[in-house]
Structure formats: structure tokens, C-alpha cells
Curated annotation (Swiss-Prot):
Subunit and interaction comment: Homohexamer.
Keyword flag Ribosomal protein: no
An annotated GO BP: protein catabolic process
Cellular component terms per the entry's GO annotation: plasma membrane
Protein name: ATP-dependent zinc metalloprotease FtsH
Protein's gene: ftsH
Periplasmic side: 26-104
Amino acid sequence: MNSTVKTIVFWVFILACCILLWQVFQRSSNTGKEQEISFSQFLNDAQQGQIHDVTVVGGEVHGHFRSANAAFHVEVPTNYPQLYDILNKNHVAVTVKDNSGSPWWSILIQFSPVLVLVALWFFMIRQMQSGGNKALSFGKSRARLLSMQQKKVTFKDVAGVDEAKEELKEIIEFLREAQKFQKLGGRIPKGVLLVGPPGTGKTLLARAVAGEANVPFFSISGSDFVEMFVGVGASRVRDLFEQGKKNAPCIIFIDEIDAVGRHRGAGLGGGHDEREQTLNQLLVEMDGFEANDGVILVAATNRPDVLDPALLRPGRFDRRVVVGRPDVRGREEVLRVHAKKVPLAEDVDLRVLARGTPGFSGADLANMVNEGALSAARANRKVVTMQDFESAKDKVLMGAERKSMLLTDEEKRVTAYHESGHAIVAAMRKHADPLHKVTIIPRGMALGVTMQLPEEDKHTVTKDYLETQLAILMGGRIAEEIFLHQMTTGAGNDIERATEMARKMVCEYGMSRLGPLTYGKKEEQIFLGREIAQHRDFSEETARQIDAEVRSLVDEAYRASYQLLNDNQPIMHKMAAALLERETIDANDIRMIIEGKDLPPLKPSGGSGTATTDDVQQVLKPSSDRGAGGLPEGSPSPA
């Protein structure tokens, strides 16, 4: 019986109970208007001629008196045959009604109040269940079933993570042909843990595995287990695995498993809490699987360091698949997947876009394609152009433009020199990344941005690279001192980042005269998920040496940038003027300014246009005396 039929039957039952209840009350109200008299009084009144008419219904007599036409009723014995003779002799009108109907109707009328109360109770329970309270289903799993009839996701929809797909293809073979592996003594993996940064496609990979294997897919979040009531989490875990076994072979996917799988005993309020009971039940269920159940648990997290060791051991999560950010070839594949539904102009080169987006995750690339489509729609274009994608990339990297933010002329001048200081140091220092764009249009929380993109993906960086970044960060403050003869708060974030970078070089990377040593043991709480303190495991003298080394690194970068900007004052003035005139200059503009060439006149729309990624790759390639650059990993430098 489906839910629609159940609903109809339920409301028909409610209507019948209401009718019964109405008849009971109607009968009670009619009876209350009649005067109840004794049988002897009834006979006496009949013999005296005071009764006008009567109606005989079984063992009851209803009638009216002649005076005032008052109504009465009386119970009469069934074995009193003289009753009709007395009534006829005294000229009383007699009406007899048959009472030979079904006795069930009388029984229903008698029990109708109880039935109505039961119906109301069921109605209230249904209302509570259909609302947010779930009064009787707290212990039920909230997993959503993605059945085989729904839209499938396959490996064709997943790109840029070839290694992860290869790892998961064996899982598909296990689900399709489990007997093939069991004949050779192989054991089907009980769990697969997907580990990687946010936005890399862990959830999409899990759905693709279910789609390729053509099996049911249960999806639930780690936060859906624990509620305010004790024992609910463990009950939901049991119910989840019971559903999985009924639909085997299947996949159970738990997203953000760190919400329920954190290290036990690390809570600030003690070790015996509801989350730990849920984790214990999860451990028992995973360890209790039989080899031929055909239920595989897939979980995803970006914090594997906080998970309980018992959850990660072989026999529970047998495999750990790392899903990282895609490389340049992977980014091109991801862009092709997301661009299938987008009409592209002829000038769009996805390979160039992939080269210009190092460090982007799959979600970032999908967002960029979507923003490009929205940009084209706002301009009433029928196709998405390369300029739309470049604008979308800038929006993803630097934030949306805040053109409505009003800045005074003096604030614009300060921002122009500040960003020019960053750009000149980045363009004339070796070991730096290519500049992409400089703007004094407020974006995000910054009044201006100097943006650069690495030529290739970086996995490790050198000491020379970090020293170059320190010099670039100091460029904004130095430009204010040399050309404006004052300091502003705009350099606050630059100084903070430079200090943090220099301290890491000394205390973590061993890039100082103190040698390859680590100073300051971090104190982390698994419950909080991040460090809350730093244990000082060195002496006062060592602390002074650390401070001296940090200051030495920052001072050296400061002196180098000061000398560079002081020697190139004409270029600084020219770049600041170009920024004040155009608000945004791209890679070609920066190259022409440094080479002493005049910039082309402004376009009618105002502005020098948007830089393409080809420009980014061509700007001031590193040479023996200077290189092209910017801030690390495409991070914008706030003014």
C-alpha cells in the first residue's frame, strides 16, 4: 500500500469517527430534552388520559403529554401485553418502530468516543513525525538512497584525479565480480577513505564508483548521526548498516567523517560522550562485516590527522586514497568536463586557462566556468569568450570588484604607489613568479591587489624563493616611505605575513644560522582541530637568537627592496600614474612600463583590457639579472 492510499484510508477513518461522535452527541442532546418517568407513573398518566401520543422503539417508549405538549420517555418491560390495551382504551396514538437492525451499529455508537480518541492520538503522532520532531524515528538513519534509476555519475564525469580513479576501479570490480576475487582467497575491502583538500571531488568520486558498479548508493553526513538525545547516534549507525545489508551489494558513503570519527578521549569535557558512543558503534559495525556481504563503506575527509587510529587500521578502512588538486593536464580535463554545457567562442583555449590556474581545485574550476557563463549572460552574448573566463578567474582569485566603494584621490594615490611597490620588486627580483595583473579597484577586503600566477605547480620552494617573497611583501611599505614620505595601515597585512614567513623559515624550515633545528612544539587539540598553543622548548638565549634571525631576514629583504625601488623611481612614478589613469594594468602594460615604452591609448570603454594567460607566461622571464614575479601561489597582496 503506497503512501497516497494510506493517507486516503486514514482520513476516511477520521471522517467515520467524527460522524459516529456526532450521532452520539445528537442522541444525547435529544434524550436530554425528554423527561424520564417511571413505568408506574406512565400507566397512571395513560389511564387518566394525560398522554397524547407515544412511539414504541423496542423496550423504550417516547411520547408527549396533552398539557403543554411536554416530551417524556420511559423504559417498559417486554413481557407486559396489557400495555397496548391501556393505550387504546385511553385514545393514545401509538406508533411502533422496528428495532431489528444490526447490533454492530449500536456497538459502534457505544464505542465511538473511544475510537475517536484513538484516531486523534494517531493523528497527533503522524503530525509529529511529518514535522521536524521525528518523535518516534530518532534512531532511524537519515541516509539518502541514490538508486540505480536515478541519474548516474560515472568516471566520465570525473577528471583530473586519474590516480584516485585507478585505485577505485578495483572497488568496482569487487562489487561486480566478488566471486572472482574470493576464489583466490582475496578479501573484499571493507572501507575506503578518500583524503584530500576541499573541492577536489571526493564526493563525486564516491558517486561515480556507485554509478560504475551499478549498485545502490547510501549517502549521509558525519554530522547526521549525533543528536541531543543519548543513544541516537549509535542507533542510527546500526540502522544505516542494516539498510546497507538489505540492499547489498551497495556503497555506504559518509561525508566529513571527522565529525563523528575524531580521536576518542580528546574532548575537553571528558571521554564519555555521545560522539564517542557513535564512533564505538561504527567501529563495531565495520569490524562485524562478513566477507561476502558486498557492503563497502566509503568515507571522505580533509582532516585525516584527527581521526581515531582504530578507525584507520586495516580491516576497517583498508585503503586510503589521496585526492589532490589537479595538475595542468588534470585542470584542462576538468575544464573540458564543465565546459560541455557552455557554448564557447572560438578564441577560448582551455589549455591556456589550465596553465593560468595553478593551485585551483575542481570546485574552483567549476566556479570559474560558471562565473564566465554568468558574465557572458550579463553582457547579452550568446557564447562565452576568453575575456569572460579571464574576468571570472580574477573574481575567483581576488574577489569581486567593489566599484561602488568611494575612495578619495589621496587614498587612490597611496594605493597606486603601494601596489606599484609590490609590482616593481616582483618584476625585478629573481626566483619570483610571473605577474598577472595590478589593480587599485577594491576587491574583496583589499583596496588594491597585485596578482601573479606561478608558471607551473609548486610542491616545494627554495630559500631564495621565500626571501624573494619577503622582499615583495616589503615593497608596499617601502614605496609609501620613499614616494609619500609617510606610513599607512595598508601594509599591516604585508608585515604580518612577512613576519610569519620569516619565523617559519627560522623555527620550522631550518633556513637560518641556527641550523636545521625545529623550535616550538605545537600543542594541538584533536577536539578543536587546530593548534591552540605552542610549547616553548628552548631557553631565553635561544629565544633571543630566534628573534634576531627573524629580524635579520626581514631587514635584509627590506634593504634589498629599498635599494631596488630607490634606483627605479622613474619607473615607479610611471606605473603609479598608469594605475591612477587606468585603475588596472595587465602583464603587457607592466612589461612596457619597465622597458620605458609608452602605453597605448585607453580604449573607449576605459581601461587597458584584461590580460590573457599568454601574457602571464611572457612577462619578464627570469634571467641572470632579473626575473618576473609576484606573491606565492597567486595570492593577492592587499593594499
